[in-house]
Amino acid sequence: MKDEQLYYFEKSPVFKAMMHFSLPMMIGTLLSVIYGILNIYFIGFLEDSHMISAISLTLPVFAILMGLGNLFGVGAGTYISRLLGAKDYSKSKFVSSFSIYGGIALGLIVILVTLPFSDQIAAILGARGETLALTSNYLKVMFLSAPFVILFFILEQFARAIGAPMISMIGMLASVGLNIILDPILIFGFDLNVVGAALGTAISNVAAALFFIVYFMKNSDVVSVNIKLAKPNKEMLSEIFKIGIPAFLMSILMGFTGLVLNLFLAHYGNFAIASYGISFRLVQFPELIIMGLCEGVVPLIAYNFMANKGRMKDVIKAVIMSIGVIFVVCMIAVFTIGHHMVGLFTTDQDIVEMATFILKVTMTSLLLNGIGFLFTGMLQATGQGRGATIMAILQGAIIIPVLFIMNALFGLTGVIWSLLIAESLCALAAMLIVYLLRDRLTVDTSELIEG
């Protein structure tokens, strides 16, 4: 490893180390939200709510592709960071090679089992009438790009795992920048509508994945793309999948939750789906910034779990304080100019009113949601596979009954409030799990929460 990477892992001031690892991730996730918003923003100029709904309905599929990337990216990435903390550099080459080609194989399987059934999958997602064909066309492009989307998530995690967060950010910047350029060209110039939006995202992911491959081939002595090293053994599989499977389940259940939510919203009409799609993109700004903060420090936590547990504790305290500051700023913004923010995407006043309401409700859960992100990251970083698995299952198990109960009692308003209730319960569950495992983490969780 390079001396600079070791410096941030071991010696730099905690806040400086946190920002070194997290800031590129925060910027990258923020930019990814921007091009997600731009898809809807550009499509919004066509003044067709069916197209906005089509893009919104595909969110669960993207969550599943992200989950497949996390299966190897998070699982192998945290393992690589622990190996580096233990100074076992050679083993990381075998871990990375197996994960890269495993991810590509998964992507090819996705194409084979989904592409012939894109119409049926669109219907399952809740697409009806005019929205059905639009959603199906968007999905076809997503499925064809699956190997590169999965590979992008894996390689981006590896860049952070080895202490090169700036490379991670550059890769994401390249992807976002290219997508911003391609969207208007493909949507308007070639008159491809939602297919143009999907193609812009797909091409951008291909370019970013190729960037990471070239970087690792030329610059890394701990991550290998040599297929000859893709030889797993029992220990490697155990270490990768005990964290990778919970990360995968978390994304899959997030996608399943999105599917169930879409079905509930579809019952209340196209305006409900479009309203949620707009508010979801706006909530993603602070949510993914916080997620970037929490995911960014996972390699730092994983490394110091092996090398310096006192430093690990200081990192966690700094992250909690940062989450609190972000929460306060975002709440002020949403409750003062939220209506104007939503108005950027549509002139339909019914959608503006509903999306603003959803935005305020979901933003309220940001603080506990952020704590949940952090504690889930701690479980992943420290190799607590059982705790991470329980947390992943709970995230899916909690939201479904809450949705059914709130919908039965309060209708559409209940569906919206169920998001806040479920997020809060998940965060409390994460805090409880970390507290119960505190001896293994050697972190006094109650002290962190109080201090």
UniProtKB/Swiss-Prot annotation:
GO cellular component term of the entry, any: plasma membrane
Residue stretches spanning the membrane: 26-46, 54-74, 97-117, 139-159, 170-190, 194-214, 245-265, 282-302, 318-338, 355-375, 397-417, 418-438
Membrane topology according to the record: Multi-pass membrane protein
Family: Belongs to the multi antimicrobial extrusion (MATE) (TC 2.A.66.1) family. MepA subfamily.
Keywords: Antibiotic resistance, Cell membrane, Membrane, Transmembrane, Transmembrane helix, Transport
GO biological process: response to antibiotic
InterPro entries from the UniProt entry: MATE_fam, MATE_MepA-like, MATE_MepA_subfamily, MdtK-like
Entry protein name: Multidrug export protein MepA
CDD domains: MATE_MepA_like
Cross-referenced Pfam families: MatE
Disulfide links within the chain: none
Location(s) in or outside the cell: Cell membrane
Gene name as annotated: mepA
Domain of life: Bacteria
GO MF, any single term: antiporter activity
Role, per record: Multidrug resistance efflux protein.
